[in-house]
Regions:
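Proline/Glycine/Serine-rich low-complexity intrinsically disordered segments
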Residues: 1-133
Length: 133
């Protein structure tokens, strides 16, 4: 799902979801990604579900996908052991909760809720259930 180094991309068919950060990275790092994959063009998918179907059917050899999504999808596949997540060395992405600027009351409640989940171990259980880590 992720490639350990750019060298293993040579001639491989790589899938990516349209509009995703992975699709942006293909264009952002052409020497690292685009110039190495088959026909210098990834196979674009409207959903990761469709990409996983092609990955399972060997129509693509890899899928450029954020590890959060990869782990989530793998947890919900019938045979997750058929796949392997490999860190690519691409920059990490961070996720956030968006709220209206200046709304400190909502921010405080969200922060308190997340902290409560962390302290009670529930956040770790959620991560394990949905993302396998």
């Amino acid at each position: 799902l992720f490639f350990p180094s750019p060298q293993v991309l040579f001639g491989k068919t790589l899938g990516v979801q349209s509009g995703s950060s992975g699709a942006q990275d293909i264009d952002r790092y052409p020497k690292l990604l685009k110039q190495r994959i088959k026909k210098h063009t990834p196979v674009l998918y409207d959903t990761f579900n469709n990409a996983f179907i092609d990955l399972k059917a060997d129509r693509i050899q890899g899928l450029l996908i954020d590890s959060v999504y990869a782990n989530y999808y793998l947890q919900h596949l019938p045979n997750p052991g058929d796949y392997r997540v490999i860190k690519s060395g691409m920059p990490n992405e961070y996720f956030a909760v968006g709220i209206k600027k200046g709304n400190q009351e909502v921010k405080q409640k969200i922060d308190q809720g997340i902290e409560h989940l962390r302290k009670t171990g529930e956040l770790q259980r959620i991560n394990q259930k949905w993302f396998g880590k």
